[in-house]
Amino acid sequence: MTLEATIVCLDNSEWMRNGDFTPSRSEAQKDAVNLICASKTQSNPESAVSIMSMAGKKPEVLVTLTQELSKILSGAQELKINGKIDFSTTMQIAQLALRHRQNNHQHPRIIAFVGSPLKETKEELIQLAKRLKKNGVAVDIINFGEVTENSDKLEAFINDVNNNDESHLLTVPPGPHILSDIILQSPIVESGSGQFGSEFINADTDPDLAMALKLSLEEEKQRQERERKAREEANGGSTNSGTTTTTAPTESNMDVNFEDDPELAEALALSMATDKMEVQSSTTNTDSQPPQQQQQPPTDDTSSEAFKDQDFLNSTLNSLPGVDPNRIKNALENLSKKDEDKDKDNEKK
């Protein structure tokens, strides 16, 4: 499944109290959110999900982009019903949050649940869609509840935001069906989530099974994450290239962040220049060491001259236990004669 950063926007307006979905629009939405978030996090361990509310005093980010399924589901459960939705403002806030995602390789996506009337006109939604498309943000919308009033507007919105069939509109009329089951078989939940099966558990009808499913999904995600980290550590420990690959994105991110602050950029450049000077200095010291080592031979010459001193030689040999000074003297004299003979032969040549 595609590596994505997904912001799920939830309708928490007063309209969500209606009971035309089982058991209510709000509860049906919660079940569907559980399905979508589990699908996104399980299909790719690097994908991240965020939760936003669309109603109340203002749209609000409840959970920032994260890969922790338990944190995502917990934030969705804390949603409070209040006021009317502000669809346009929600889309703009979500787009801004996606622009500042940490992993730029993640494809930005917004999934919005719309279960109450939209205050925006069709023209306003079209303009909003064009801005989202320009910034490469894909949008999926689940239109349920107020289908008659919102369908025309949302169809126009999706038509303008759609790029390479990456955006989708799912319209679900009220009825005895379960919202999450319909979403499960729609393009919004891609084939990578087929592991959940068509028998997705309703948390209200069977809470024990729903909790077991949630825990198993979380354990599977943690297992995949451990395997991924183990592979990265193995690759990084075996070769130096792995370390270089790991640190490179951090350096590039620093360059991007410093572009807006010339003083920080200058300080970074100066520090890098200082590091280079220190490296060059250490290299120069290393290169200068061999000449110092070459100066050691004169010390050897001095020691050889000392051995030519008879008094020094006698005192040294006499101080050594078990050593016959006369034998040592004879050996040294023989060596000296051989050296003299070699010198004479060289002079004749």
Curated annotation (Swiss-Prot):
Compositional bias of kind Basic and acidic residues: 219-234, 335-349
Residue ranges of the region described as Disordered: 219-257, 274-349
Extent of Low complexity compositional bias: 235-253, 280-301
InterPro entries in the record: PSMD4 (IPR027040), UIM_dom (IPR003903), VWF_A (IPR002035), vWFA_dom_sf (IPR036465)
GO CC, one annotated term: cytosol
Domain (UIM) ranges: 204-223, 259-278
SMART domains, sorted: UIM, VWA
Record's keyword terms, sorted: Proteasome, Repeat
GO molecular function: polyubiquitin modification-dependent protein binding
Record-linked Pfam families: VWA_2
Annotated VWFA domain residues: 5-188
Gene Ontology BP, a term: proteasome-mediated ubiquitin-dependent protein catabolic process
Top-rank taxon: Eukaryota
Signal peptide: none
Role description: Binds and presumably selects ubiquitin-conjugates for destruction.
PANTHER family named among the record's database cross-references: 26S PROTEASOME NON-ATPASE REGULATORY SUBUNIT 4 (PTHR10223:SF0)
Homology family: Belongs to the proteasome subunit S5A family.
Protein name per UniProt: 26S proteasome non-ATPase regulatory subunit 4
